[in-house]
Swiss-Prot record:
CDD domains named among the record's database cross-references: AGPR_2_C, AGPR_2_N
Localization (cell): Cytoplasm
EC number(s) given by UniProt: 1.2.1.38
Stretches that traverse the bilayer: none
Organism: Brucella melitensis biotype 1 (strain ATCC 23456 / CCUG 17765 / NCTC 10094 / 16M)
Pfam family, one: Semialdhyde_dhC_1
GO cellular component, one term: cytoplasm
Presence of keyword Cytoplasm: yes
Name of the protein in question: N-acetyl-gamma-glutamyl-phosphate reductase
SUPFAM superfamilies: Glyceraldehyde-3-phosphate dehydrogenase-like, C-terminal domain, NAD(P)-binding Rossmann-fold domains
Function of the protein: Catalyzes the NADPH-dependent reduction of N-acetyl-5-glutamyl phosphate to yield N-acetyl-L-glutamate 5-semialdehyde.
Active site: residue positions: 117
């Protein structure tokens, strides 16, 4: 019998991407609520309870409601793509490459919180250095990032693409989250194993999909004042054998004139780079990914596969 998958919110940006991916699969049965009945709470509850795995592609409050509809019904496993449960101790964090044993935790979990797109890149860079003891827990980490505008959902997509939209945005690039209170920061701090709240400065570019995340560090402030090669070796060892996360060789990175945010658009992979100069004692760690791929729908499908033993 094929496992039943219900995407609650399949008409949103992430939900549509997941639905498209699963449409090509013949090993699953995707059950869909009629669009006209999406706000029928009782019917949604029936679909949620009928599923083996429910993938929630909803705003935070709506995700909380969906989870409440499954109270006392533990046979349905949940993947939540919202921010709601990413720092909740009862939910497995859905970044399979986070640490040793994380794949198994996801595979065995009933409740999985899909990571945010920005934290996926930042944590991918920071966590290995923390686990290896190179990055002090109290280091004042700063994260700078730019995302494709699809990360803002249907509203931002319309504002960027429709010139007749009343709130049309003509900017080619803009900063937001200016008070430094972005909702991804708690997730980044917890799963990055940082004692000190990191500074996170996100921005959006005039391109649909893609993302660059940067974490600049002073080598002299890291444990043992490591070389670029040592930092690179830690990342390489951490992701050895992983098929989705690639650590670009140091020599190859040194030859690059630029990094294109759209390089991995439409793909599920993530590339990590180590840039810098020994002379100045500075390193810039860079993650390249698709905000809707490894940063959202790709990760959700990866987690679903792990939960199904695939």
């Amino acid at each position: 019998m094929k496992p039943k998958i219900f995407i609650d919110g399949e008409h949103g940006t992430t939900g549509l991407q997941i639905r498209t991916r699963l449409a090509e699969r013949d090993d699953l049965e995707v059950i869909s609520i009629p669009e006209a009945e999406r706000r029928n709470k009782d019917l949604r509850a029936d679909y949620l309870r009928a599923a083996d795995i429910a993938i929630l592609c909803l705003p935070d409050d709506a995700s909380k409601e969906a989870v409440s509809l499954l109270e006392g019904h533990n046979s349905t496993r949940i993947i939540d793509t919202s921010t709601t449960h990413r720092v909740h101790p009862d939910w497995a964090y859905g970044f399979a490459e986070l640490a040793k044993g994380q794949r198994e935790r996801i595979a065995e979990a009933r409740l999985v919180a899909n990571p945010g797109c920005y934290p996926t890149g930042a944590i991918a860079l920071v966590r290995p250095l923390r686990d290896a003891g190179l990055l002090p827990a109290d280091y004042p980490v700063s994260v700078n990032a730019v995302s494709g505008y699809t990360g803002g959902g249907k509203q931002l997509i319309a504002q960027m693409e429709d010139r007749n939209h009343p709130d049309y945005l003509a900017a080619n690039n803009f900063l937001y989250g200016l008070p430094l209170k972005h909702k991804h920061v708690p997730e980044l701090q917890l799963h990055g194993r940082l004692d000190r709240r990191p500074i996170f400065s996100p921005s959006v570019g005039r391109f649909p999909q893609g993302m660059i995340v940067q974490v600049p560090l002073f080598l002299s402030e890291l444990e043992g004042s490591p070389s670029l090669a040592k930092v690179h070796a830690v990342l390489t060892e951490h992701y050895a054998g992983q098929d989705i996360v690639e650590v670009v060789p140091l020599e190859e990175s040194a030859k690059l004139p630029r990094v294109d945010a759209e390089e991995l658009a439409g793909k599920d992979g993530m590339k990590l780079f180590v840039f810098g100069t020994e002379d100045h004692g500075q390193v810039n760690l860079v993650a390249l990914l698709d905000n809707l791929g490894k940063g959202a729908s790709g990760a959700a499908v990866q987690n679903m596969n792990l939960m199904l033993g695939k």
